[in-house]
């Protein structure tokens, strides 16, 4: 594993430990060059309450690796989380910089009604 990936994983581990202390559900984001994924994980950390990604049927048709796709995933995860009864989450960016696609997803989720 290269140093860049190791430091990202280390940052993510520290952030997740802090979120566990808070005891709230977390919106976990993962990105690859081609897709972006989002999951709302329960406060206990044992189950996924809601999930959305660019692999979903309605989002798969267009371009999946850009900011527009990330904001579509953000809107979708906000809808699904609210339908599951979750309105407040901690944003887990998985060690990725809060920039570009990760920021677009977070902004769209906030507009969709999730509180961070």
UniProtKB/Swiss-Prot annotation:
Q: Which UniProt keywords apply?
A: Ribonucleoprotein, Ribosomal protein, RNA-binding, rRNA-binding
Kindly give the Pfam families that the UniProt entry links to this protein: Ribosomal_L18p
**HAMAP family per record:** Ribosomal_uL18_B
Q: To which species is this protein native?
A: Saccharophagus degradans (strain 2-40 / ATCC 43961 / DSM 17024)
Q: In the UniProt record, what gene is named as encoding this protein?
A: rplR
Q: What is this protein called?
A: Large ribosomal subunit protein uL18
**Listed PANTHER family:** 39S RIBOSOMAL PROTEIN L18, MITOCHONDRIAL (PTHR12899), LARGE RIBOSOMAL SUBUNIT PROTEIN UL18M (PTHR12899:SF3)
Similarity annotation: Belongs to the universal ribosomal protein uL18 family.
* SUPFAM superfamilies named among the record's database cross-references: Translational machinery components (SSF53137)
């Amino acid at each position: 594993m290269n140093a860049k990936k190791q430091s990202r994983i280390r940052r993510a581990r520290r952030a997740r430990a802090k979120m566990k202390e808070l005891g709230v559900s977390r919106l976990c984001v993962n990105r690859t060059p081609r897709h972006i994924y989002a999951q709302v994980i329960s406060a206990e950390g044992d189950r996924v309450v809601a999930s959305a990604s660019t692999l979903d049927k309605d989002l798969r048709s267009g371009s999946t690796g850009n900011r527009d796709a990330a904001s579509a995933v953000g809107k979708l995860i906000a809808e699904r989380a609210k339908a599951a009864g979750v309105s407040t989450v901690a944003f887990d960016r998985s060690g990725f910089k809060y920039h570009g696609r990760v920021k677009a997803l977070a902004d769209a989720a906030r507009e969709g009604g999730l509180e961070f």
